[in-house]
Amino acid sequence: MKWITLICLLISSSFIESRILFKRDTDADHHKHIADVYTALTERTFKGLTLAIVSQNLQKCSLEELSKLVNEINDFAKSCINDKTPECEKPVGTLFFDKLCADPAVGVNYEWSKECCAKQDPERAQCFKAHRDHEHTSIKPEPEETCKLLKEHPDDLLSAFIHEEARNHPDLYPPAVLALTKQYHKLAEHCCEEEDKEKCFSEKMKQLMKQSHSIEDKQHHFCWILDNFPEKVLKALNLARVSHRYPKAEFKLAHNFTEEVTHFIKDCCHDDMFECMTERLELTEHTCQHKDELSSKLEKCCNIPLLERTYCIVTLENDDVPAELSQPITEFTEDPHVCEKYAENNEVFLGRYLHAVSRKHQELSEQFLLQSAKEYESLLNKCCKTDNPPECYKDGADRFMNEAKERFAYLKQNCDILHEHGEYLFENELLIRYTKKMPQVSDETLIGIAHQMADIGEHCCAVPENQRMPCAEGDLTILIGKMCERQKKTFINNHVAHCCTDSYSGMRSCFTALGPDEDYVPPPVTDDTFHFDDKICTANDKEKQHIKQKFLVKLIKVSPKLEKNHIDECSAEFLKMVQKCCTADEHQPCFDTEKPVLIEHCQKLHP
């Protein structure tokens, strides 16, 4: 299968056929037919995306094995353009899984598929999704082999990347797989010209995979919101995001785009991938049709090929805030008729509020803006019952700005700690905080969370000040969402459960405000609680830091009420012990002797 042609044509495609933008069939069973999707996407795009999707669902199959299935699905789709059989009228997702289930090799290679194929949609699609392996091991060719393939058989190299990227990221939006493939092609061309190819590939692939994980995390986060909160939460988040990105868009247009974005996200999360992809491409075209009303920065995106255009729009920086928005917003706190407007249609009125503050305040995070809208709603619910509502809600704007100042101050405090002490000590500070908040979590998970939080701090504290809060709170909320997903499967404690379920917009601030878990009962210290051996003496710096962090976590779990100065004292004593024992003639006997002395010293500090 010669996929290099596919990739090149994907990149050079122009506009796709537009499909009834913003018109939604009220029938819940409405779906596009496969001939419509095939025509809209073109054959080459259809085959490329089909390869990505089958690779995500049949992860053990080789590229050669999947080629036959891809061609079979493609031939059937092509036949449906002129031959409208009853089967062609089925939803695209249904047809896709019909083809998978009809393939004898699928039943042989995937025993579980028999159970899935016996189900009806949407349960069948959900069953396949549930069996995706998220721990699949990637096959990474050596740089020399990669460069040889690039020179002699570039089609094989790129098709292999689509296959590998898709099965290693089974929930990644398939067009994103193709966009990443294009970047990989450029990366390979660049690194194959470098003298130190191995270093170049290592550094560039790390960046590309980080981008891949980021796209997948954001996509997964949207689905997590839909699964755990009312749909209006996702709509509000999208409205804040659209208003941030396109501040000159009026409310009606911003609201329409919000509805469209929310609809295609729902299709993606329900695993209706063909519907999802078609709608994403439609939204791209619709965005370009309205570029003058949306953003002065869209021109550069709308003049490039389709695949690049979609990625360009998704990653586009916010447009400049129009000069007329520099004036204070008065219509929500100074208008004497606020309560009448709120009573007339509270959802639309609150949407207008969220749109107004989001387009004006790009320096504020979407999560803060959602929380502000929720607090404004509470304010109106209270004030509109009083004898003098305007007097009651007139301080709403001051309250909003004071809360924003507090949030900025907290962010600055953490960035100052990071800059003063460095990432590793900042990571340890976070590790202490979160071990006290949720001591029930495993040592390695806590260390991983602290490391990811420190990475977010390192990245977001380095961006311009007016971008820090959106960066930090956006990324932290995604990380906390993952934590909450684990909490749902493996209960941590009541305080964490409350933060995960009470309010999406307040989730990050809820976790920040959490104190030590007062209900936690520390386990008794045994000989197995702490383990020190001479491996630390030969460990590299990174490994030594990890060993120290494991000691920190264990220490807090058995002595959760230790104050910061006592934790620092114990850490210093730990380092003294390591220094002493690693210079002793016999390392292990020294550790065995010094361990109980260290533990007893630290336990005496515990109140």
Curated annotation (Swiss-Prot):
It holds the Pfam family Serum_albumin. InterPro entries: ALB/AFP/VDB, Serum_albumin-like, Serum_albumin/AFP/Afamin, Serum_albumin_CS, Serum_albumin_N. Residues 22-209, 210-402, 403-600 form the Albumin domain. Serum albumin, the main protein of plasma, has a good binding capacity for water, Ca(2+), Na(+), K(+), fatty acids, hormones, bilirubin and drugs. Its main function is the regulation of the colloidal osmotic pressure of blood. Its main location: secreted. Disulfide bonds join 80-88, 101-117, 116-127, 147-192, 191-200, 223-269, 268-276, 288-302, 301-312, 339-384, 383-392, 415-461, 460-471, 484-500, 499-510, 537-582, 581-590. Cu cation binds at residue 30. GO terms for molecular function: lipid binding; metal ion binding. It comes from Xenopus laevis. SMART domains: ALBUMIN (SM00103). It is found in: Secreted. Keywords: Cleavage on pair of basic residues, Copper, Disulfide bond, Lipid-binding, Metal-binding, Repeat, Secreted, Signal. One of its GO terms (cellular component) is cytoplasm. Belongs to the ALB/AFP/VDB family. PANTHER family: AFAMIN (PTHR11385:SF14), SERUM ALBUMIN-RELATED (PTHR11385). This is Albumin B.
